[in-house]
Regions:
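Polytopic transmembrane helical bundles with strong interfacial aromatic enrichment
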Residues: 1-286
Length: 286
């Protein structure tokens, strides 16, 4: 169930991000922000992104994409408790890594989810969010430090998984605390014929984009159990960080390409990270 719901959530994220990039926005209209055409299963589809809300009768039947995210998170947490927390003494604790009781290991795991979310949410709500470069440097540095710290507390496999748990929790938090509430406030304003606060749409879109960039790394971590030579590597935290850079830059490259912006310099960052990754894996063997 967790994998199925995750597929649906990721599919939604990719679809709407793709549509936003592909819509023709050079339209002179007071109501239409962008439009485009698609073809699927033998039919043409017209897509229109509106500047203002649709008629009230349409608002009452809006399709809001939220349950994919909610169910992915709920099923993931259930699996976390049933498989890992219940068997924490075996799956989470390694006395060679750190002398810690299973109870403390579980508490640290739970606290890490809340702590990372609070820090990330604070950064998003601060003026720092206006400086993309600085925001990226700080969040990636935080990810690197978190990955390193977790490998010094938990078993290698659970440390890897914990990074995915943290990112997945952030993605859910974005949907549950920002995206959906903002959308509901926009709908309420529309139903009352009040002016829509554009900052609500911008904040929701911003968090949605963050989720989009996190997706590849979370999916990689979900599958990392199949790559023991990476998970149990001496420098697994650095390997994970290299993958984070490669996957994020790849996502950014294709997002720009969807808007017909070709920036090959982004690929240079990916290539450097890939060379660094290969060096770690093949020179410093487990």
């Amino acid at each position: 169930g967790h994998v199925l719901f995750a597929i649906l959530w990721v599919g939604n994220s990719f679809l709407f991000n793709y549509l936003d990039n592909k819509l023709n926005k050079s339209i002179s209209s007071s109501t239409i922000d962008g439009e485009g055409y698609l073809m699927h299963s033998g039919y043409f589809y017209k897509l229109t992104r509106l500047k203002k809300s649709p008629p009230t009768n349409y608002l009452k039947n809006l399709v809001i994409f939220k349950w994919q995210s909610y169910l992915t998170f709920v099923t993931g947490i259930l699996l976390l408790f049933v498989i890992y927390y219940y068997n924490s003494g075996i799956l989470m604790v390694n006395k060679k890594v750190l002398e810690i009781s299973p109870v403390y290991a579980v508490l640290i795991s739970i606290l890490s989810l809340f702590f990372y979310w609070l820090v990330y949410d604070f950064l998003c709500k601060s003026s720092l969010i206006k400086n993309n470069v600085l925001f990226i440097i700080i969040t990636f540095s935080l990810l690197l430090l978190t990955s390193f710290g977790l490998t010094k507390i938990f078993t290698p496999k659970f440390a890897f998984l914990s990074v995915g748990l943290i990112l997945g929790t952030n993605m859910f938090g974005n949907v549950f605390t920002v995206i959906i509430p903002n959308q509901m406030n926009i709908i309420k304003s529309s139903l009352k014929n009040k002016k829509i606060d554009s900052s609500l749409s911008l904040a929701a879109k911003q968090r949605s984009i963050h989720n989009n960039y996190s997706t590849f790394l979370v999916l990689f971590i979900m599958l990392s159990g199949h790559y023991s030579f990476i998970v149990y590597h001496k420098y697994n935290w650095l390997i994970l960080f290299a993958f984070a850079i490669i996957l994020a830059t790849a996502r950014h490259y294709f997002n720009l390409r969807g808007r017909k912006i070709i920036n090959n310099s982004i690929l240079i960052i990916s290539i450097i990270a890939f060379i660094f990754l290969a060096f770690l894996i093949f020179v410093f063997k487990p």
